[in-house]
Amino acid sequence: MDELITKHSAIMDEYDPEKRVGLIVDEWGTWYDVEPGTNPGFLFQQNSIRDALVAGVTLNIFNHHADRVHMANLAQTINVLQSIVLTEGDKMLKTPTYHVFDLYKVHQGGRVLPIELIGEGLHLSASSDPLGKTHISVCNLSQWEPVSLELAINGEADSVQWQATILTGDREMLIIRLRS
């Protein structure tokens, strides 16, 4: 996704250097083989932590390119492909993708902040919301290894209130340390 947006943005920048025209990404998300025993025409897919990582990385990419990406639409939202909810009769389940969207909503309407990553295995983005709060979203891309993350924040860290929310599977896969 990053390569596609980067290449399209480069072409658009030639003809629209003021970035008046936005790029719209339509129907992004995972697309796997149909679940056995389901109607192939309905494209039902179970959702897992893998889908949460795809959503997190993709939303980070959109955040990095917020100067050009003005809208991005998940392919499906209910019971199909990378759904945010699954339903059966009167029952409803929020998927890992739902929880990623819930965590990432703090970036909407914000200003992208420059962020530097030293090392491998993590994908992240940062923004400042209209109230001046800084939000950092991090994805650990390792299937097996937990990752330790140390954040160096410019400014007065003692006067800042920190909060972390971690979406994970059976194992703790991300350890966060903050320093000024």
Question: Where are the regions that the model predicts?
Answer:
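Phosphate/diphosphate-binding loops
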Residues: 1
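Aromatic/acidic polysaccharide-binding cleft in carbohydrate-active enzymes
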Residues: 20-133
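Acidic, Ser/Thr/Pro-rich beta/coil linker or hinge segments at domain junctions
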Residues: 157-180
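Short helix-capping segments at alpha-helix termini
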Residues: 14-18, 67, 156-157
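Membrane-embedded translocation segments of transport machinery
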Residues: 4-5
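Carbohydrate-binding surface patches
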Residues: 121-158
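Composition- and surface-driven signal marking solvent-exposed, interaction-prone regions
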Residues: 85-90, 138-140, 147-154, 165, ...
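Active-site-proximal structural segments of metal-dependent nucleotidyl cyclase/transferase enzymes
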Residues: 8
